[in-house]
């Protein structure tokens, strides 16, 4: 199994259990999330109250919760939305922090293509939800989620060059 960690913080953000598609010259990974029901365990203990003349089984009140699989699995923490100025400030700081961590070849590609990916994200800014890894570190990678037209499940966007592949 492969796990993808934030290159700057070490937070686990994704695994190969969630297939991705590269977009914007490989700068972003697009991953489909799914809403899932967590909790609501149906336990059959073998009792049959109706056959024994007892009352109808009322069960247990176990709180079923609807969560997004990626957010739940990697304990992503939702952040308040950014306005354009905040987002541009974040991107400048992120590029400054990430670039030295990349090898020379990746630095060239990153510098060449990150502007296009940033413009793409800016065009969707009002539709994006923002997440960070479990440590909630300020300098960490942001993970973005949005809903494509007509979709009921969110699509997540990751900065590909901000992820480090770890074999488990």
Curated annotation (Swiss-Prot):
Chain segments annotated as coiled-coil in the UniProt record: none
Membrane-crossing segments per the record: none
Record domain TCTP: where: 1-168
Primary localization: cytoplasm
Listed GO MF terms: calcium ion binding
GO cellular component: cytoplasm
Subcellular location field: Cytoplasm
SUPFAM superfamilies named in the record: Mss4-like (SSF51316)
UniProt keyword list: Calcium, Cytoplasm
Entry function: Involved in calcium binding and microtubule stabilization.
Family that this chain belongs to: Belongs to the TCTP family.
Protein name: Translationally-controlled tumor protein homolog
Name of the encoding gene: TCTP
């Amino acid at each position: 199994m492969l796990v993808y960690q934030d290159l700057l913080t070490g937070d686990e953000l994704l695994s190969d259990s969630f297939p991705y598609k590269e977009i914007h010259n490989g700068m972003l990974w697009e991953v489909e999330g799914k809403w899932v029901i967590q909790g609501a365990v149906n336990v059959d203990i073998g009792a049959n109250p109706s056959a024994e003349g007892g009352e109808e089984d009322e069960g247990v009140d176990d709180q079923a919760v609807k969560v997004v699989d990626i957010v739940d699995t990697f304990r992503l923490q939702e952040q308040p939305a950014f306005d354009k100025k905040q987002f541009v400030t974040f991107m400048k700081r992120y590029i400054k922090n990430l670039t030295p961590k990349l090898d020379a070849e990746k630095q060239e590609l990153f510098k060449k293509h990150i502007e296009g990916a940033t413009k793409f994200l800016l065009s969707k800014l009002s539709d994006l939800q923002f997440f960070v890894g479990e440590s909630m570190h300020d300098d960490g990678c942001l993970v973005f989620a949005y809903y494509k037209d007509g979709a009921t499940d969110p699509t997540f966007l990751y900065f590909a060059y901000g992820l480090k592949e770890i074999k488990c």
